[in-house]
C-alpha cells in the first residue's frame, strides 16, 4: 500500500468561517472562547476530510489564527519588546494578533511586525524579528494541544513545524538582513536548537511518530555557510526520538541536492510539479530505509492532474523504493480553494477541468491506489474519467481565440517607447500644476457593508442596472467631495464598483472564469478569490472609462484612472497551464493597452497601473531572473506606451524588496511609482538612492494594514528621511496601499493628518 499524506490544508474553512470568527473577535462581537470553539470545529472537519480521503497522517500545526510563521514565532517566545510581553509568561492570543496587525481586544496598540510575501506565492507571512543574543523558549502550548485534539478524534498525526534554518532565513532585524546573505543570523542557532529539541521531545512524548519539518529555504541560492549549517543543525536534531520528514517545495533542490541527501532525516519531500527532473537523482541518492515523499499533485494551481503522466513518472521509482515512496501534493494546499462542491454556478464543462484542495486529496488517493496496483474496477474508472476530462479541456473551442492569436503574432512590432522622462514630467507639471510633495491615495476607499450589498443585489438581479449605476455614482461623488474637503491633490474615484482589484477586470475580459466560493488566504483574515484564466484573453469593451470619466467630471483636480497591471493580474489568478505564462501576460498587456488609450481619450490625465506583484513573480533562483524580468517589464511597457507625454503614468508596488530588481523597476519607466515603506521605516528607499532612480516616487507614510491612525509628526519624520535620500521635488506623499479594508473614521483621520504632514513639509 502506498502511503499518501498532506503537507497542509486550507485553514480558512469552506465558508471562510475562520475569517468571520477572527474579525468578530477583533470587533468585540464574540468571546475568545467562541473563537477557540470555531478553531476546534474547523480543525476537526479538516482532519476528518483528509482522513476520509485516505491521508495516513493528518497534518497538525498547519492551522493558524493569523499566519503559521507567526504561530511558530510566538511558540518560540520571539516577541519584540514593544509589545510589552512579560518575560517568562506564555504568549497569549492577543499578543499574537498585535504582532500581526498592531492591535487586539486587549493590550496597547503597537507597530505591527513587517509582513512580506511567502516565497513566490501570493500568501503573506509575518516576518520574525531577530536580535543579537536573542533567547528562545517554548512559550505557547497550542501545537501540543492540537496534537492531543486530533489524537482524541482517532487520527494518526504528523505535526508540521517550520525548520530552524528556514525560520532564520525568513527573519530579519536591525542587525540582521532577510535571507541567506547574512550569516550572522546563524549565531542564533545555539539558542534556538534546544527549543526545537524540546518541542520534538514533547511531541514524541505524545506518541507522535513522524514530524514534518519544513525547509523550503533548501530550494534557494544558499551560501556554503548555510549548507554547512544544515548539516550541523540536523545532526543535532537527529537525536530526537521522532522521525523527521524534511519538506522542500516551490522549486527543485538543484545545487543543494547533496546537502539535502546528506541530512540524517528519516524522509525527504520534494516538489515534482515545479521540478520533475530531480526525481531520479533524489531517489538514487536516498539512504537505505529513507522515505521519499513525491509531491506530484500541484498544490498551487486548480487544474486536474494528468494522473497517467504522474504514474509514468512514478512507476520506476515505486519499483525501486517500494513502500518507501510516499505521495503528497507538491506543497501545502493553503494556496488553493477548499472544495469544488461549493461551486454551483460554474458550467459543467469548466468544472470538469478543475481540482480544489478536497479534490486534490481524492486525486492523490486515486493515484496511490493505481500506483499500488489496486485491482478495484473503480480505480480504472477513476483514471478513465480523469483522462476524459483532460482530453475535453485540450479540445475545447473555448480555449483559443483567432483574433487574439492574430494580434499576438504582430505584438512584437507594437511600440513600447515614450518620450524621455524629463520631457514628459515638464509637460505633465505644466498641465497638472501640482504643489511640492503632492498628495494622493493608492486607489480604493473603504468598502462599507452598504457598498457590498449594492454589488451583491445588482449581481443577483435584485437591483436594476440603472439603480445600481446611480448608487455607484453617488458613492463616487461622495469620495470625490471627501478628498476635496481633506485637501488631496490627485484624486481617485474610490473603486466602489470593485470587489477585488483582479476579479473586477477578469469579469470584463474574455478568457476568464469566476468561482462563487474559491477563496484563498492572502494574509491574516484577508481572503482573495482569484479568477481563473482558462483561455485567450481579450477586452470586448472598455472596463473603467465610464466610472473614471464621471469622477473627473465632478472636479477640476486630476482624477487617476485605476488599472491593475498585466503581471499582477497574471500572478493573482489561477493561470492556464497549457501555454507559457509569458504568452498569457502579453495577451493581458494588449488588452490593458487598449484601456489606457481609451482613458486618455476620455480626458483622464493621470493613469495608475498597479503592479504590486511584479517581484513575487521572480523565480526563486537568481539565474532565472533575467528572463522573467525582461518579459515582465516588456509587458508593463506594452500596456502603457500607447499614450502621449502629457499623460502621467503611475504604478504601485507593495510588500517588495527592491534592491535586487531596481534596474528593472527603472526600466518600467513609470512617471511616478508609489511603494510600501512605512513598516520598514523607509529602509526600502536605499535601493532607489543607491541606484539614482530617475523618476518620481511616493514612499508610503502610513501602514494601511493596521487600524492605528498615524501621528502627523511621525509622517513628517518619515518624509524627511525620504528627502534625505532622494530629491524632494520628486517625492509624493501617500499611504502604503489602498484603503479598501479600513473603516471611514480612521481613514478620514489618517488622510487629514497626511495632508497636514505634506503642508508642514512644504512650509519648511
UniProtKB/Swiss-Prot annotation:
<dbReference type="InterPro" id="IPR013215">
    <property type="entry name" value="Cbl-indep_Met_Synth_N"/>
</dbReference>
<dbReference type="GO" id="GO:0032259">
    <property type="term" value="P:methylation"/>
</dbReference>
<comment type="similarity">
    <text>Belongs to the vitamin-B12 independent methionine synthase family.</text>
</comment>
<protein>
    <recommendedName>
        <fullName>5-methyltetrahydropteroyltriglutamate--homocysteine methyltransferase</fullName>
        <ecNumber>2.1.1.14</ecNumber>
    </recommendedName>
</protein>
<feature type="binding site">
    <location>
        <begin position="442"/>
        <end position="444"/>
    </location>
    <ligand>
        <name>L-methionine</name>
    </ligand>
</feature>
<keyword id="KW-0486">Methionine biosynthesis</keyword>
<dbReference type="InterPro" id="IPR002629">
    <property type="entry name" value="Met_Synth_C/arc"/>
</dbReference>
<feature type="binding site">
    <location>
        <position position="654"/>
    </location>
    <ligand>
        <name>Zn(2+)</name>
    </ligand>
</feature>
<keyword id="KW-0028">Amino-acid biosynthesis</keyword>
<keyword id="KW-0808">Transferase</keyword>
<keyword id="KW-0479">Metal-binding</keyword>
<feature type="binding site">
    <location>
        <position position="495"/>
    </location>
    <ligand>
        <name>L-homocysteine</name>
    </ligand>
</feature>
<comment type="pathway">
    <text>Amino-acid biosynthesis; L-methionine biosynthesis via de novo pathway; L-methionine from L-homocysteine (MetE route): step 1/1.</text>
</comment>
<feature type="binding site">
    <location>
        <begin position="16"/>
        <end position="19"/>
    </location>
    <ligand>
        <name>5-methyltetrahydropteroyltri-L-glutamate</name>
    </ligand>
</feature>
<feature type="binding site">
    <location>
        <position position="616"/>
    </location>
    <ligand>
        <name>5-methyltetrahydropteroyltri-L-glutamate</name>
    </ligand>
</feature>
<feature type="active site" description="Proton donor">
    <location>
        <position position="705"/>
    </location>
</feature>
<dbReference type="Pfam" id="PF01717">
    <property type="entry name" value="Meth_synt_2"/>
</dbReference>
<dbReference type="Pfam" id="PF08267">
    <property type="entry name" value="Meth_synt_1"/>
</dbReference>
<keyword id="KW-0489">Methyltransferase</keyword>
<keyword id="KW-0862">Zinc</keyword>
<feature type="binding site">
    <location>
        <position position="610"/>
    </location>
    <ligand>
        <name>L-methionine</name>
    </ligand>
</feature>
<comment type="function">
    <text>Catalyzes the transfer of a methyl group from 5-methyltetrahydrofolate to homocysteine resulting in methionine formation.</text>
</comment>
<dbReference type="InterPro" id="IPR038071">
    <property type="entry name" value="UROD/MetE-like_sf"/>
</dbReference>
<dbReference type="GO" id="GO:0008270">
    <property type="term" value="F:zinc ion binding"/>
</dbReference>
<feature type="binding site">
    <location>
        <begin position="526"/>
        <end position="527"/>
    </location>
    <ligand>
        <name>5-methyltetrahydropteroyltri-L-glutamate</name>
    </ligand>
</feature>
<keyword id="KW-0677">Repeat</keyword>
<dbReference type="GO" id="GO:0003871">
    <property type="term" value="F:5-methyltetrahydropteroyltriglutamate-homocysteine S-methyltransferase activity"/>
</dbReference>
<feature type="binding site">
    <location>
        <position position="572"/>
    </location>
    <ligand>
        <name>5-methyltetrahydropteroyltri-L-glutamate</name>
    </ligand>
</feature>
<feature type="binding site">
    <location>
        <position position="495"/>
    </location>
    <ligand>
        <name>L-methionine</name>
    </ligand>
</feature>
<feature type="binding site">
    <location>
        <position position="676"/>
    </location>
    <ligand>
        <name>Zn(2+)</name>
    </ligand>
</feature>
<feature type="binding site">
    <location>
        <position position="652"/>
    </location>
    <ligand>
        <name>Zn(2+)</name>
    </ligand>
</feature>
<dbReference type="InterPro" id="IPR006276">
    <property type="entry name" value="Cobalamin-indep_Met_synthase"/>
</dbReference>
<feature type="binding site">
    <location>
        <position position="737"/>
    </location>
    <ligand>
        <name>Zn(2+)</name>
    </ligand>
</feature>
<feature type="binding site">
    <location>
        <position position="610"/>
    </location>
    <ligand>
        <name>L-homocysteine</name>
    </ligand>
</feature>
<feature type="binding site">
    <location>
        <position position="117"/>
    </location>
    <ligand>
        <name>5-methyltetrahydropteroyltri-L-glutamate</name>
    </ligand>
</feature>
<dbReference type="GO" id="GO:0009086">
    <property type="term" value="P:methionine biosynthetic process"/>
</dbReference>
<feature type="binding site">
    <location>
        <begin position="442"/>
        <end position="444"/>
    </location>
    <ligand>
        <name>L-homocysteine</name>
    </ligand>
</feature>
Amino acid at each position: 500500500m502506498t502511503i499518501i499524506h498532506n503537507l497542509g490544508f486550507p485553514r480558512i474553512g469552506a465558508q471562510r468561517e475562520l475569517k468571520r470568527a477572527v474579525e468578530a473577535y477583533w470587533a468585540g462581537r464574540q468571546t475568545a472562547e467562541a473563537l477557540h470553539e470555531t478553531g476546534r470545529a474547523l480543525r476537526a472537519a479538516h482532519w476528518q476530510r483528509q482522513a476520509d480521503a485516505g491521508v495516513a497522517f493528518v497534518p497538525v500545526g498547519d492551522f493558524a489564527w493569523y499566519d503559521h510563521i507567526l504561530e511558530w514565532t510566538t511558540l518560540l517566545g520571539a516577541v519584540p519588546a514593544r509589545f510589552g510581553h512579560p518575560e517568562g509568561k506564555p504568549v497569549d492570543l492577543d499578543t499574537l494578533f498585535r504582532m500581526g496587525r498592531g492591535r487586539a481586544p486587549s493590550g496597547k496598540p503597537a507597530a505591527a511586525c513587517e509582513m512580506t510575501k511567502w516565497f513566490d506565492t501570493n500568501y503573506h507571512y509575518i516576518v520574525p524579528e531577530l536580535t543579537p543574543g536573542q533567547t528562545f523558549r517554548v512559550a505557547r502550548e497550542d501545537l501540543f494541544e492540537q496534537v492531543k485534539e486530533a489524537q482524541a478524534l482517532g487520527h494518526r498525526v504528523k505535526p508540521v513545524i517550520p525548520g530552524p534554518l528556514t525560520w532564520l532565513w525568513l527573519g530579519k532585524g536591525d542587525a540582521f538582513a532577510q535571507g541567506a546573505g547574512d550569516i550572522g543570523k546563524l549565531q542564533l542557532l545555539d539558542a534556538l536548537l534546544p527549543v526545537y529539541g524540546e518541542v520534538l521531545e514533547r511531541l514524541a512524548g505524545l506518541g507522535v511518530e513522524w514530524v514534518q519539518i519544513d525547509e523550503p529555504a533548501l530550494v534557494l541560492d544558499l551560501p556554503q555557510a548555510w549548507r554547512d549549517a544544515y548539516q550541523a543543525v540536523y545532526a543535532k536534531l537527529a537525536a530526537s526520538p521522532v522521525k523527521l520528514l524534511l519538506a522542500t517545495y516551490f522549486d527543485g533542490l538543484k545545487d543543494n541536492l547533496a546537502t539535502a541527501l546528506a541530512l540524517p532525516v528519516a524522509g525527504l519531500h520534494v516538489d515534482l510539479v515545479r521540478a520533475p527532473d530531480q526525481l531520479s537523482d533524489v531517489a538514487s541518492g536516498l539512504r537505505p530505509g529513507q522515505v521519499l515523499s513525491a509531491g506530484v499533485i500541484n498544490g498551487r494551481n486548480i487544474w486536474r492532474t494528468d494522473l497517467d503522466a504522474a504514474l509514468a513518472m512514478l512507476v520506476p521509482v515505486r519499483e525501486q523504493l517500494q513502500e518507501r515512496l510516499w505521495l503528497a501534493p507538491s506543497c501545502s494546499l493553503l494556496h488553493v480553494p477548499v472544495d469544488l462542491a461549493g461551486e454551483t454556478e460554474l458550467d459543467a464543462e469548466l468544472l470538469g477541468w478543475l481540482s480544489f484542495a478536497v479534490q486534490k486529496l481524492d486525486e492523490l488517493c486515486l493515484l496511490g491506489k493505481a500506483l499500488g496496483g489496486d485491482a478495484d474496477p473503480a480505480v480504472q474508472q477513476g483514471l478513465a474519467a480523469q483522462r476524459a476530462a483532460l482530453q475535453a479541456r485540450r479540445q475545447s473551442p473555448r480555449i483559443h481565440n483567432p483574433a487574439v492569436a492574430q494580434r499576438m503574432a504582430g505584438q512584437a512590432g507594437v511600440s513600447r517607447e515614450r518620450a524621455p522622462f524629463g520631457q514628459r514630467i515638464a509637460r505633465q507639471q505644466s498641465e497638472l500644476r501640482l504643489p511640492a510633495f503632492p498628495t494622493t491615495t493608492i486607489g480604493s476607499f473603504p468598502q462599507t457593508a452598504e457598498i457590498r450589498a449594492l454589488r451583491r443585489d445588482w449581481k443577483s438581479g435584485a437591483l436594476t442596472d440603472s439603480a445600481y449605476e446611480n448608487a455607484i455614482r453617488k458613492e463616487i461623488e461622495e469620495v470625490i467631495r471627501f478628498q476635496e474637503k481633506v485637501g488631496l491633490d490627485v484624486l481617485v474615484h474610490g473603486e466602489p464598483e470593485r470587489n477585488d482589484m483582479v476579479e473586477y477586470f477578469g469579469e470584463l475580459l474574455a478568457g476568464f472564469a469566476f468561482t462563487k466560493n474559491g477563496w484563498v488566504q492572502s494574509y491574516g483574515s484577508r481572503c482573495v478569490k482569484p479568477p481563473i484564466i482558462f483561455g485567450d484573453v481579450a477586452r470586448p469593451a472598455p472596463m473603467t472609462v465610464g466610472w473614471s470619466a464621471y469622477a473627473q467630471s465632478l472636479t477640476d483636480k486630476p482624477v487617476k484612472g485605476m488599472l491593475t497591471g498585466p503581471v499582477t493580474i497574471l500572478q493573482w489568478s489561477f493561470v492556464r497551464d497549457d501555454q507559457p505564462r509569458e504568452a498569457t501576460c502579453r495577451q493581458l498587456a494588449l488588452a490593458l493597452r487598449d484601456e489606457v488609450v481609451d482613458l486618455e481619450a476620455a480626458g483622464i490625465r493621470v493613469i495608475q497601473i498597479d503592479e504590486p506583484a511584479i517581484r513575487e513573480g521572480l523565480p526563486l533562483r537568481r539565474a532565472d531572473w533575467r528572463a522573467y524580468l525582461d518579459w515582465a517589464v516588456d509587458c508593463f511597457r506594452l500596456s502603457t506606451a500607447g499614450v502621449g507625454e502629457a499623460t502621467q503614468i503611475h504604478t504601485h508596488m507593495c510588500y517588495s524588496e527592491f534592491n535586487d530588481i531596481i534596474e528593472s523597476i527603472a526600466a518600467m519607466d513609470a512617471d511616478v511609482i508609489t511603494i510600501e515603506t512605512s513598516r520598514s521605516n523607509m529602509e526600502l528607499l536605499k535601493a532607489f538612492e543607491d541606484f539614482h532612480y530617475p523618476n518620481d516616487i511616493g514612499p508610503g507614510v502610513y501602514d494601511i494594514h493596521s487600524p492605528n491612525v498615524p501621528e502627523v509628526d511621525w509622517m513628517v519624520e518619515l518624509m524627511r528621511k525620504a528627502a534625505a535620500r532622494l530629491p524632494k521635488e520628486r517625492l509624493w506623499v501617500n499611504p502604503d496601499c489602498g484603503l479598501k479594508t479600513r473603516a471611514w473614521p480612521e481613514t478620514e483621520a489618517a488622510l487629514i493628518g497626511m495632508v497636514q504632514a505634506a503642508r508642514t513639509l512644504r512650509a519648511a
